[in-house]
Amino acid sequence: MKILVTGTSGLIGYNLVERLLKDGHEVFGTIHKNNKRVKGVEYFYGDLRDMEFCKEITEGMDVVVNCSANTSNAVDTVKSPLVHVTPNVIVNTQLIEASYFSGVAQYVFISSSTVYPPSGDKLVDETWNIFEEPYPVYHAVGWMKRYGEVLCDLYSNQLSPSMDCIVVRPGNCYGPHDKWDFDKCHVTPATI
């Protein structure tokens, strides 16, 4: 299977391409800086905010996994909550559109647990109301990720022909290939 993974220098993307290669898939990745690379991945160098680049890289792919995200650290999310909204909305919108018009069979969107509202003492399941406000600290990021999920619903349930879309909402991930520098890392690595 030909699989494109965006965000291959990040924690989830890097580990995912390693696994996909191990499973025998033909793996392609995107890179926008001189970031770390995985041997065996064919890389496209460019900017996912460029629609022509998105069209070029999705052409001929069976699956596109969007692990890319304009991120920094938890402190930035609190101090400058809008810093990541516009770049991520542009990338998410263009990548799913390019995937659809390129005939990609399956699109996987890596969302975030920031979409959930505060739950207090109750457990949250899939029946929660998506229009409840996200946790206040992650309000901007939560709504931005929710918009990506709404796009997935549009392309998989509202259009004909449709494109199979999967939404994954990881929690506070950490592990090999994560950012461990306190000034750049997310909450979990910062506490370790």
Give the residues covered by each predicted segment.
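Conserved glycine-rich Rossmann-like NAD(P)H-binding loop of the short-chain dehydrogenase/reductase
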Residues: 25-32
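Conserved catalytic-core motifs of eukaryotic protein kinase domains, centered on the activation segment
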Residues: 74-82, 118-123, 177-180
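Conserved Rossmann-fold NAD(P)-dependent oxidoreductase catalytic core, especially the SDR/UDP-sugar
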Residues: 66, 93-138, 158, 163-166
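NAD(P)H-binding glycine-rich loop region in Rossmannoid oxidoreductase-like domains
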Residues: 35, 45-88, 101
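Flexible, glycine-rich beta-alpha linker
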Residues: 115-117, 139-140, 163-188
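Short alpha-helix in the Rossmann-fold core of NAD(P)-dependent oxidoreductases
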Residues: 84-92, 108-111, 144-145
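N-terminal Rossmann NAD(P)H-binding glycine-rich loop of SDR-like oxidoreductase domains
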Residues: 3-23
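Active-site Tyr-X1-5-Lys
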Residues: 136-169, 192
